[in-house]
């Protein structure tokens, strides 16, 4: 039950009952009417701008129209009071019986409260991480991994048919370098002194096991094999090894994908898929042969002062046209991007989200342009850019011992502080803003540590049920109908907690619509704060405690409230990919 959707329907019925609105309905923009929480909670529980939106096209004074609406709203038995503020905002205060009914609905729904049909089963593809398979994941990949995974969870909860996808960049020049780096480690495994790793190769010790595995499988045969024979073999083995390592890193962070799509598949059969995609663009008039003027500043790798096959991307929103086929006949990296998008589109995805690092900002316009060109404007592509993560310890820039190469790995961070703090804190900032991650802060047991504060609220909820089991040993809590007991909840501070729970469905839909999973993390912290505040009031006033062994009926009702809080906390934590512990010590 969505409080705001419910009252939107009630207000719409009232508007339909007003004669002048019925007469001019076709001239009115109902889409601009909002039903939302008031900015100031002291004004009420629900606010609407309906009178402000409709008054001008109706030729009425906003307050006069508001008075008409207020008169009819005041007749609703579940409305305790209605007032008009300012030039015509309408504020509604709900009755105790309405909050009780809502609490009953939340307890019945449990962890499914807030689940929405907003997405209407539409297919959506969320691509995230897509790190080059050239080594273990570093902390720079961590934020995009969490944001993408949590966003996919959120969209599924909001009713979309979600596919989580990883694009394996396994066809570029970096894979050639990786194969040669692994071959060097193979020679080392055979006893050869390789001295220093030559410049340009990958120096990380993570390739040592790959070299040893090659030595075990092939013995000395690779060393005497022609280069054009051993390179493809080593490429295959090292890509498999790197992807196994990356999958382990992702699993450590509780990040999951449904599809791992190999870029090499686009180049199979003479790059048939890339050819098909370019032919499709050509047929639609988006491809021509020409020479691009040199861009300002540093020249990009795909620029040539020769005739190339170009994508006329400036006609579909890009700043410059993009090369597809170089003068030597080879395909550009962007040509594979075109084929990959077409593959997704052909798989039935008309909504796609790419979660990329901030360093990919220059790719946004070209991706949006190819989406318009391939789909004819029918596909919706969204690019989310994740800003950098800076590591600190007690406010000082972190200087960690590095396990591999010269970077801090994702596993370094997860192994030190745990999966839950990493996941939750990666969501505790809007992804477009830089994030400071302090190893000391994320393990503090205080309200200043959001993940602890939220998880502790859930653990406290579960502890209330353990207290109840001791207070009422003859009561089977698993079979109690908490919804039926909700009528005993009457205290104003308890109503504040129900009101905060009532916001959850709206937060879910707004976060899904804006592709902002951080809104869930923010909401969970706010809910935890209201719950902890009520818990502390119970310490000061025994009458407000959740369990009162002298009042069984009231205790059962309050257990229903606690059950509702625990359910929403668990639901939201599940979206963020974070656990909801029953105990915390």
UniProtKB/Swiss-Prot annotation:
It is an enzyme of class 6 (ligase). GO terms for cellular component: cytoplasm. The keyword Zinc does not apply. Pfam families: Arg_tRNA_synt_N, DALR_1, tRNA-synt_1d. It catalyses: tRNA(Arg) + L-arginine + ATP = L-arginyl-tRNA(Arg) + AMP + diphosphate. SMART domains: Arg_tRNA_synt_N, DALR_1. It is found in: Cytoplasm. GO terms for molecular function: arginine-tRNA ligase activity; ATP binding. Monomer. Belongs to the class-I aminoacyl-tRNA synthetase family. Keywords: Aminoacyl-tRNA synthetase, ATP-binding, Cytoplasm, Ligase, Nucleotide-binding, Protein biosynthesis. GO terms for biological process: arginyl-tRNA aminoacylation. It comes from the Bacteria. The keyword Nucleotide-binding applies. Its EC number is 6.1.1.19. CDD domains: ArgRS_core. A motif ('HIGH' region) lies at residues 131-141. This is Arginine--tRNA ligase. NCBIfam families: argS. Its main location: cytoplasm. PANTHER family: ARGININE--TRNA LIGASE, CYTOPLASMIC, ARGINYL-TRNA SYNTHETASE.
